[in-house]
């Protein structure tokens, strides 16, 4: 992965990725509906990093804007930060990113399932299903600021416990 010498703000990072994605889609001459889905997915692909445990792991100031990248740290520093963060082993921010966008219909545009699939399969961890259910993904009191824990838990149960995510993956594979 990339080495960042300085902290990178989450909103700046996602906006930069969305803009690069838009330019690339335009240069490739992709169909507008596909370009829109890619750009929306890029804009929200790291929303799960707003989880307060993830921010703690990155060393973010709880009163400052959310971080996407922590800046340069040694392997030992990164390991200690992960251990102190209360994130369970195997927790993936892209799963929470997909959940947060699913819980915010205004972020998905017309191609909801495609946007969610791209987000959930980002970072080279594309998977047909996630190993973790709603109880593993969320922890009350650590949800991103401005989100409703109960609403997120309800949506997470639908997506990851009941099986909507698996259906979504199957439908968008065709």
Which ranges hold each PLM region?
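Short, small-residue-biased leader/transition segments that mark boundaries at the very start
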Residues: 3-4
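Phosphate-binding active sites in nucleotide-utilizing proteins
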Residues: 7-23, 37, 43-44
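Divalent metal-dependent catalytic cores for phosphoryl transfer on phosphate-bearing substrates
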Residues: 29-174
